[in-house]
Design a protein with these regions (language model features):
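FAD-site-proximal beta/loop scaffold in flavoenzymes
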Residues: 1-68
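Beta-strand scaffold of nucleotide-dependent catalytic cores
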Residues: 26, 146-150, 160-163
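Residue-level detector of anion-binding/catalytic polar loops
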Residues: 16, 112, 172-173
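A short, polar/charged loop-to-alpha-helix boundary motif
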Residues: 154-171
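Mid-to-C-terminal Rossmann-like scaffold of FAD/NAD(P)H-dependent oxidoreductases
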Residues: 42-154
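Cysteine/selenocysteine-centered motifs that mediate thiol-based redox chemistry or coordinate metal-sulfur cofactors
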Residues: 169-180
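Generic alpha-helical structural context detector
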Residues: 60, 71, 164-165, 178
Length: 180
């Protein structure tokens, strides 16, 4: 997303850092040093779909990581399952959002994929105020949803939230046509 971790102060601490300086943690948010936890923008996490190491400096995942680290410090034994990196950006009255992997990430991983572009209205066209939006869905040959991007004036957040939920619920791309 374009940020770098400010972890230089940890270089001689014994805490393992990734090649770009991110703190390496396990799925309990613990570093390689027992009892030392890290969360947020400075850590490397697992991509939810492909289990690869990724940096996702977003508030939502950071909050979840903080709760998981606190629970583990308290002995509750919770695990972080990774992140889809779901995010939204508003530019004046237009919104752009994404979830999961984009084409560039999939190409870097050597994954084969298909892309579907659709241009629905934000809601039923017979109801006043409908506006067009563009939705791009990326999926595998067998229908696994890898990611999506959307842009428009209304309804972008709803579409991306539904798709991120579909990914976490292991729905296939063709299951989306049945969602009401």
């Amino acid at each position: 997303i374009g940020v770098s971790p400010d972890t230089g102060f940890l270089r001689d601490s014994g805490i393992n850092l990734g090649e770009r300086g991110h703190i390496l943690v396990d799925d309990s948010m613990q570093t390689n040093i027992e009892g030392v936890y890290a969360v947020g923008d400075a850590i490397m996490v697992k991509d939810y779909l492909h289990r690869t190491d990724v940096a996702i400096p977003l508030a939502g995942p950071a909050n979840r990581q903080g709760r998981i680290a606190a629970d583990n410090i308290a002995g509750l034994g919770r695990t972080y399952k990774g992140s889809l990196g779901t995010s939204i950006l508003k530019i004046f009255s237009m919104a752009a959002a994404s979830t999961g992997n984009n084409e560039r990430n999939l190409q870097r991983m050597g994954k084969e994929y298909r892309v579907l572009y659709i241009h629905p209205n934000s809601h039923a066209s017979y109801y006043p105020g409908a506006t067009p939006l563009t939705l791009k869905i990326i999926f595998s040959e067998n229908g696994d949803i890898y990611g999506a991007q959307a842009i428009g004036y209304k309804g972008v957040d709803k579409r991306i939230d539904i798709i991120s939920t579909a990914i976490k619920g292991n729905l296939k791309v063709w299951d989306l046509q049945e969602i009401e």
